[in-house]
């Protein structure tokens, strides 16, 4: 898999090794308490939805990997319905990016349906 497909999300499953920890100590930044956190999650089954719901209710954004399921899978349809309901309840947003990711946002954050470069 080339670098561009990794950046743009082309195919293949992701692991925690695909995410690189960046050392911010080399940068002069003001590091206060963040009002929002971004969580990465994997959805293997219905039980994984609880932690995602809790994170969104707590005001955090979640990017969930759904590569273990097909989007036509009845379990996945039920999971997506549950997450849609959470997004509605908190006045957030939810989108599915390709066949491998779902992004769920908390109150006050919407997701543009248009690419920046396209």
Swiss-Prot record:
<dbReference type="GO" id="GO:0042802">
    <property type="term" value="F:identical protein binding"/>
</dbReference>
<keyword id="KW-0131">Cell cycle</keyword>
<comment type="subunit">
    <text>Homodimer. Does not oligomerize. Interacts with FtsZ2.</text>
</comment>
<keyword id="KW-0717">Septation</keyword>
<dbReference type="InterPro" id="IPR038594">
    <property type="entry name" value="SepF-like_sf"/>
</dbReference>
<comment type="function">
    <text>Involved in cell division. Probably acts as a membrane anchor for FstZ2, tethering its filaments to the division site. May be involved in septum closure.</text>
</comment>
<dbReference type="GO" id="GO:0005737">
    <property type="term" value="C:cytoplasm"/>
</dbReference>
<dbReference type="GO" id="GO:0042803">
    <property type="term" value="F:protein homodimerization activity"/>
</dbReference>
<keyword id="KW-0132">Cell division</keyword>
<dbReference type="InterPro" id="IPR012426">
    <property type="entry name" value="SepF_arc"/>
</dbReference>
<dbReference type="GO" id="GO:0051301">
    <property type="term" value="P:cell division"/>
</dbReference>
<dbReference type="GO" id="GO:0032153">
    <property type="term" value="C:cell division site"/>
</dbReference>
<protein>
    <recommendedName>
        <fullName>Cell division protein SepF</fullName>
    </recommendedName>
</protein>
<dbReference type="InterPro" id="IPR007561">
    <property type="entry name" value="Cell_div_SepF/SepF-rel"/>
</dbReference>
<dbReference type="Pfam" id="PF04472">
    <property type="entry name" value="SepF"/>
</dbReference>
<keyword id="KW-0963">Cytoplasm</keyword>
<feature type="region of interest" description="Important for localization in a ring-like structure at midcell">
    <location>
        <begin position="1"/>
        <end position="12"/>
    </location>
</feature>
